[in-house]
Amino acid sequence: METVLILCSLLAPVVLASAAEKEKEKDPFYYDYQTLRIGGLVFAVVLFSVGILLILSRRCKCSFNQKPRAPGDEEAQVENLITTNAAEPQKAEN
């Protein structure tokens, strides 16, 4: 009986040590939010700076020239097409 008590008393620190080691292991769902926030802000600043540099450099241009149109210009074109189609005589099909 005494040997069983001695063995149990020797195993108790081992069991407690293994429980303490499990607590010390890193939780896979733990995130370092401070580092994540700083990394995101740095990434946003870099993208913002690249966008401003592209706008200011004026190297990003269209390959063809476009004339600026007035806001009602498209409506006038549609009305002209309608009136020209109505003015043309209908061809009779045989």
From Swiss-Prot:
Cytoplasmic topological intervals: 58-94
GO cellular component labels: glutamatergic synapse; postsynaptic membrane; presynaptic membrane
Localization per record: Cell membrane
One Gene Ontology biological process: positive regulation of sodium ion export across plasma membrane
Extracellular side: 18-34
Source species, domain of life: Eukaryota
Topology with respect to the bilayer: Single-pass type I membrane protein
Tissues and organs where the protein is expressed, per its UniProt entry: Expressed in the neuronal fibers of the medial part of lateral habenula nucleus, thalamus, hypothalamus, stria terminalis, zona incerta, amygdaloid body and cingulum, olfactory bulb, hippocampus, cerebral cortex and cerebellum. In the cerebellum there is a predominant expression pattern in the granule layer of lobules VI-IX of the posterior lobe. Detected in inner ear.
Family: Belongs to the FXYD family.
Protein role: Associates with and regulates the activity of the sodium/potassium-transporting ATPase (NKA) which catalyzes the hydrolysis of ATP coupled with the exchange of Na(+) and K(+) ions across the plasma membrane. Decreases the apparent affinity of the transporter for Na(+). In addition to modulating NKA kinetics, may also function as a regulator of NKA localization to the plasma membrane.
Name of this chain's protein: FXYD domain-containing ion transport regulator 6
Organism: Rattus norvegicus
